[in-house]
């Protein structure tokens, strides 16, 4: 009998004896409540929602070298209709040809490999959400061609090179009358060898690296004739305008015996970031820096601290509404079954220098339960 294999954190797997196909089904949900307060600590906003509810299918068909991955999102956070009216349920739908463990090529829709924080799954975070820097500059997903090369030499020096050519308007856009395309490349260096159990895409040092492990990475993306304000995301540019956008990223990770340190630097450049002033539309030219550190106690309790800062260029500051936005976050996570079942809480303090709106929220307190199969 071809019985399914069930393992928490690894889904339900079906694989016939003939091995001509395999199917792994997974789901996860994040239930979150959040409170926001002004400078006088007066409650201004309450969030209570299923933030993420995802269903994922992975496996191979015909040959183990032909691999597929599908992911669907079902909450309002995931499915908000796109500016062109298209539905936004499909997150990943891609087929890979994997001739060897060293390299693969893919065709379809998936994450664009640019910055580390966005490449990490939202199920593998040590805070309830990614940083404000990632929220502004990440490239999210796109449809197109993807390629990856992984040099593997045991404990010694390793590297990975990743690239893609995608439709520059992001996931589920469908078609573009402009004809623009986004070109993205990323290089990852592992001078002391690779992390245990793909620890470079899991926040914190859950595996407890016995030797110091380091990742140095950089990426660049050129979005030719982008029609959305953030390239793959954001509103449509006014009056059918387009802009050429450049996005750049640098990452550093260090892990050792429960201690983890991350830093991300990223930014966006555009020669003409402004439009008709009456539209209030603009391309966020600027940079951001994120630094976070954590320590894990006995694979159960983790404490983490993060500091994130956004620096808009002077010409877009009147539209961004501030000269600088700094957010400091302290988080606590209780791991029950790794990242598959965990409880998280964090508190953030926001400070915006020369803010146009003096009544912005200063404090945020959030609690979240995550369960995944």
Where are these regions (language model features)?
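C-terminal hydrophobic structural anchor segments
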Residues: 294-343
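Outer-membrane beta-barrel "beta-signal"
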Residues: 183-194, 332-336, 341, 360-373
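Extracytoplasmic loops and strand-loop junctions of Gram-negative outer membrane beta-barrel proteins
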Residues: 8-9, 38-40, 126-131, 200, ...
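Detector for outer-membrane/organellar transmembrane beta-barrel domains
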Residues: 178, 188-192, 196-314
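Outer membrane beta-barrel
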Residues: 11-171, 176-193, 215, 289-313
């Amino acid at each position: 009998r071809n019985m399914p294999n069930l393992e928490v954190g690894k889904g339900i797997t079906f694989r016939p004896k003939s091995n001509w196909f395999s199917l792994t089904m997974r789901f996860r949900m994040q239930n979150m409540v959040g409170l926001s307060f002004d400078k006088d600590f007066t409650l201004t906003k309450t969030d209570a929602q299923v933030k993420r509810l995802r269903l994922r299918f992975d496996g191979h068909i015909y040959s183990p070298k032909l691999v597929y991955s599908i992911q669907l999102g079902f909450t309002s956070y995931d499915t908000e209709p796109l500016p062109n009216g298209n539905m936004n349920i499909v997150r990943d739908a891609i087929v890979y040809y994997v001739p060897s463990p060293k390299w693969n090529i893919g065709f379809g829709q998936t994450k664009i490999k640019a910055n580390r924080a966005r490449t990490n799954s939202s199920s593998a975070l040590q805070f309830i959400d990614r940083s404000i820097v990632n929220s502004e500059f990440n490239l999210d997903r796109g449809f197109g061609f993807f390629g990856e090369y992984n040099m593997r030499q045991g404990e010694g020096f390793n590297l990975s090179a990743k690239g893609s050519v995608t439709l520059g308007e992001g996931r589920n856009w469908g078609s573009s009358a402009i004809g623009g395309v986004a070109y993205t490349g990323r290089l990852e260096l592992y001078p002391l060898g690779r992390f245990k159990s793909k620890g470079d895409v899991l926040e914190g040092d859950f595996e407890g690296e016995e030797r110091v492990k380091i990742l140095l990475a950089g990426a660049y993306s050129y979005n030719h004739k982008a029609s959305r304000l953030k390239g793959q995301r954001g509103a449509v540019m006014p009056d059918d305008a387009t802009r050429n956008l450049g996005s750049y990223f640098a990452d550093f990770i260090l892990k050792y015996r429960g201690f983890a340190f991350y830093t991300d630097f990223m930014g966006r450049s555009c020669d003409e970031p402004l439009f008709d002033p009456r539209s209030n539309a603009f391309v966020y030219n600027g940079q951001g820096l994120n630094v976070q550190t954590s320590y894990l106690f006995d694979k159960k309790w983790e404490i983490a601290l993060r500091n994130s800062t956004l620096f808009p260029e002077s010409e877009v500051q009147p539209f961004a509404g501030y000269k600088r936005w700094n957010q400091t976050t302290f988080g606590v996570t209780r791991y029950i079954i790794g990242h598959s079942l965990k409880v998280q809480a964090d508190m953030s303090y926001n400070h915006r220098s020369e803010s146009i709106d003096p009544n912005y929220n200063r404090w945020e307190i959030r609690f979240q339960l995550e369960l995944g199969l």
